[in-house]
Amino acid sequence: MKSSPAELISEAKSSTQNSKMKRAVSVLDFILRLIAVVATLASAIAMGTTDESLPFFTQFIRFRAEYDDLPTLRLFVVASAFASGYLILSLPLSILHITRSSARRTRVILIILDMVMLTSLTAASSAAAAIVYLAHKGNAKANWFAFCQQYDSFCERISGSLIGSFIAIPLFIMLILFSALVLSKR
């Protein structure tokens, strides 16, 4: 059965609107990836360069606090750097989606890899947040003392470095949702 001219025009308009929506979402995807790169890279650098030394009795004996004294903070640096590297490598695919809005396979690959990065960054950030909480508050039952009264600069830096990762986590969620939205619109 032949379609009427009105139906053909309606389908063409729908296809054009769908293409414009995909392109707009792809541009937003690129911008969100750039913001997430900055957030995760800043978190990794801030945590990875955190250390503080305090004198003990004399100036020759010093106590030193570094991020790599705690394996959880090391995991945080690795996960943030890995997520940042992934986001940088995914930018060309995001540009491809702006130019070719019909690319489906690469969107599926990005959704899967975005989910992997989301879960690893969430796990590392949550574990680091627990350690930062213990550093600030301690745990009297386990006889762990809060050391942030002595190492205040160290604690401020490790607390601040969590901000970037907790900004990147919702960005990853939005990236996944936007890619799924584009895939659902045919």
Swiss-Prot record:
Predominant cellular place of this UniProt entry's protein: membrane
Bilayer topology annotation: Multi-pass membrane protein
Keywords, comma-separated and alphabetical: Cell membrane, Cell wall biogenesis/degradation, Membrane, Transmembrane, Transmembrane helix
Keyword Transmembrane helix: yes
Pfam family, one: CASP_dom
GO biological process: cell wall organization
Example of a GO cellular component annotation carried by this entry: plasma membrane
Annotated transmembrane regions: 27-47, 75-95, 108-128, 162-182
Subcellular locations according to the entry: Cell membrane
Keyword Transmembrane annotated: yes
Residues exposed to the Cytoplasmic side: 1-26, 96-107, 183-186
Membrane-side (Extracellular) residue stretches: 48-74, 129-161
InterPro entries tied to this protein: CASP/CASPL (IPR006459), CASP_dom (IPR006702), CASPL (IPR044173)
Protein role: Regulates membrane-cell wall junctions and localized cell wall deposition. Required for establishment of the Casparian strip membrane domain (CSD) and the subsequent formation of Casparian strips, a cell wall modification of the root endodermis that determines an apoplastic barrier between the intraorganismal apoplasm and the extraorganismal apoplasm and prevents lateral diffusion.
Similarity comment: family membership: Belongs to the Casparian strip membrane proteins (CASP) family.
NCBIfam families (alphabetical): A_tha_TIGR01569 (TIGR01569)
Subunit structure: Homodimer and heterodimers.
Annotated protein name in UniProt: Casparian strip membrane protein 1
Organism from which the protein derives: Lotus japonicus (Lotus corniculatus var. japonicus)
